[in-house]
Every structure is written in structure tokens, then in C-alpha cells.
């Protein structure tokens, strides 16, 4: 453990005290205090009520220290405090807003919870055949969007797939809070990691990426119209991407992205560009009873002979091998992949 890491661990222990058992548990993803009760989200146990009660002095002490670090006011006039600290995303709402202070902590570990190909197959997260396909999609430089509802693990799949990006191809990683940890999970690979702020937003950094020799845009989430439009322009210049979005059906993604942009004057052009420049959509779902996460849909997007296509090659357990459009097959072939359902021999290192 290096000096910086030791200092971070000491600060964690000082700041979070009674919450440390949960913070140190790799299975815990979220810690939520609503002013009365402490709720824990665990990838194995689900969401449950803890018997720990937080004193108001603990919350006050925590937000005072965090607001000082951020040099940010936190009071009835500025009642929302959002920050990143020691690989955690922290949100605190002031008591003037919610009567009692509310705290939310999301753990963003610098490792991949989908630890290995073997783990993915053993847990039935994805079949071997479909996992081969997804890995080959990255190898073939497809543009990929990972969809799902909150807390299903979209970012974890994104992190896993980045392992197949060639080391010598620069990745631009753009996010509000450091969640992807590209440099840590892909040591030795070329990348620039950008945490967005009020000075530089998604639209500006995505547009600037081309002139910065970025070959892969890794976007934590496509959720703003201007950012989506900038991303499509980015892809039209030959940049590749992996991103996430909130959805429960990958067939709806083109319309969802189009609605984000909201430019009715250029409606046909924009929707056509979504199909032209996006290639693959992956839906991740979670069983609320068992907490089991899995890939439930794989959808392809293509514009063929003036028509927009979105065939599913996997839909809740059913495989459709022959549904790959000609333009997608051509993309695979360009990178020497004749059968996209065969295993990638190694990660790109």
C-alpha cells in the first residue's frame, strides 16, 4: 500500500467511523441514510435495513469536513452537497430541504466486479457464445451503448469491456464522478481521464476529443441532448465509443437518444445518424429477489438500403444468430473476425 493510499484509508476511518464495516465490504454498493433509517444495498443480500442509527453530530461532522475539502458552502441557501471522495460518490441534502439531513454514498471501486470471464460464465451473467460476441464487438471497434435501470451494474460491464480496447489506442474517459477507473484497471494503456465541471461540460470535451487524438470515447452516461449530439458528431469522424444509458428495452434506445436531442427540424437526419453510428446495445437486468444480474438483450443498430434496423440477436434467453445485418458483419470481417461468436483469444494488452 503506497503512502497516498494509506492516507486515504486513514481519512476514510476518520470521516466515516461507524459506516466503515459497510464501506470496506466489497459487496456493498450503496449506503443510504434518510434521516431516520440506514439502508444498505448489497449485491448478494439485496437492499436491507441496518440496525445502525447515525447521530446528527456524525452527519454534521461529515458534511463539514467534505464541504471544506470541496471549498463549497452547504446551508439552507445551498442545500445540496455532491462530491467524490476516496472512490465514493457522496450526496448530502441539508435539513432545510428534507427536515432531517439525508446522506447517500455510492461505492465506485477501482476494480472490476465482473472479475473474469470465468466468473461471468459461472454466475450465468452471460452465455459463453454471447460473451464471445460482446468481446468481439470491442475488438471490431463497434460503438456500444449499455442500458439498464439504476443499480443493475451498467458501469461494471463497461469496465469489463474496456479490457479489449488496444493499448495503443487513446481512450478519453469522461464522467461527472470517477467511477470507471480506466487507468487503474487497464495499466499501461493510453488514456486521458476527465472529471467534468462547470467550466468544461460533456459537449465541449467530446467535441475537443478529436483534436486531442482520442480514438475511444468512454462516456459514463449519455443523458444530455447536447452531449448526445456531440457524441454522434464524434462517431461520424471515426471515433469509437462505449457508454451507458437508462432504459429497460434496447429497442427504444434510438428514439430515447433522439428525444434527448429534441431537434424536430432535423428529425429524419438525426434518427438516421443514431442508427448509422451506433452498432450494439446491451441490456443488463437484475432480479430483485435473488439480486442476480445478467445480460438480457443484445440489439444491433444499422442503416441498410435507406432503412433503419434494430434486430435483436439475444432476447431474454433466445438467440438469433442469423440476425446480424450486412454492415455489422462487414465491420467484423474488417478486423479479421469471421465468426463473432468464437472466443477472443486474449485481451488487448
Briefly describe each language-model feature range:
Residues 154:
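Conserved lysine of the Walker
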Residues 25, 41, 45-140:
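P-loop NTP-binding catalytic core
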Residues 1-22, 290-349:
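NTP-binding/hydrolysis catalytic cores, primarily Walker-type P-loop NTPases
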Residues 143:
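Walker A (P-loop) ATP-phosphate-binding motif of ABC ATPase nucleotide-binding domains
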Residues 151:
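Walker A (P-loop) phosphate-binding loop of P-loop NTPases
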Residues 162-273, 286:
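Switch/coupling sub-region of P-loop NTPases
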Residues 146-148:
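Hydrophobic anchor at the beta1->P-loop junction of P-loop NTPases
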Residues 157, 161:
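Hydrophobic positions on the alpha1 helix immediately C-terminal to the Walker A/P-loop
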Amino acid at each position: 500500500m503506497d503512502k497516498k493510499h494509506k492516507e486515504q484509508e486513514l481519512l476514510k476511518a476518520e470521516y466515516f467511523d461507524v459506516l466503515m464495516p459497510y464501506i470496506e465490504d466489497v459487496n456493498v454498493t450503496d449506503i443510504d441514510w434518510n434521516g431516520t433509517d440506514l439502508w444498505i444495498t448489497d449485491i448478494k443480500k439485496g437492499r436491507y435495513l441496518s440496525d445502525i442509527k447515525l447521530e446528527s453530530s456524525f452527519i454534521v461532522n461529515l458534511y463539514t469536513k467534505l464541504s471544506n475539502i470541496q471549498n463549497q458552502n452547504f446551508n439552507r441557501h445551498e442545500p445540496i452537497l455532491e462530491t467524490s471522495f476516496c472512490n465514493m460518490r457522496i450526496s448530502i441534502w441539508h435539513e432545510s430541504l428534507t427536515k432531517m439531513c439525508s446522506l447517500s454514498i455510492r461505492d465506485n471501486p477501482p476494480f472490476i466486479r465482473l472479475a473474469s470471464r470465468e466468473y461471468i460464465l459461472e454466475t450465468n451473467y452471460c452465455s459463453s457464445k454471447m460473451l464471445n460476441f460482446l468481446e468481439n464487438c470491442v475488438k471490431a471497434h463497434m460503438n456500444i451503448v449499455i442500458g439498464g435501470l439504476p443499480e443493475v451494474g451498467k458501469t461494471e460491464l463497461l469496465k469489463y469491456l474496456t479490457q479489449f480496447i488496444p493499448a495503443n489506442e487513446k481512450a478519453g474517459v469522461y464522467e461527472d464522478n470517477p467511477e470507471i477507473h480506466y487507468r487503474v484497471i487497464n495499466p499501461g494503456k493510453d488514456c486521458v481521464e476527465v472529471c467534468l465541471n462547470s467550466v468544461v461540460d460533456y459537449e465541449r470535451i467530446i467535441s475537443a476529443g478529436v483534436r486531442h487524438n482520442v480514438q475511444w470515447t468512454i462516456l459514463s452516461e449519455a443523458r444530455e441532448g447536447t452531449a448526445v449530439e456531440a457524441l454522434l458528431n464524434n462517431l461520424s469522424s471515426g471515433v469509437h465509443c462505449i457508454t451507458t444509458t437508462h432504459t429497460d428495452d434496447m429497442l427504444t434506445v434510438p428514439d430515447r437518444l433522439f428525444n434527448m436531442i429534441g431537434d424536430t427540424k432535423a428529425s429524419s437526419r438525426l434518427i438516421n445518424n443514431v442508427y448509422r453510428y451506433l452498432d450494439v446495445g446491451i441490456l443488463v437486468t437484475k432480479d430483485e429477489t435473488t439480486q442476480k444480474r445478467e445480460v438480457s438483450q443484445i440489439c444491433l443498430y444499422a442503416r441498410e438500403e435507406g432503412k433503419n434496423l434494430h434486430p435483436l440477436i439475444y432476447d431474454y434467453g433466445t438467440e438469433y444468430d442469423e440476425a446480424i445485418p450486412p454492415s455489422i458483419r462487414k465491420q467484423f470481417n474488417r478486423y479479421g473476425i469471421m465468426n463473432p461468436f468464437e472466443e477472443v483469444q486474449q485481451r488487448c494488452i
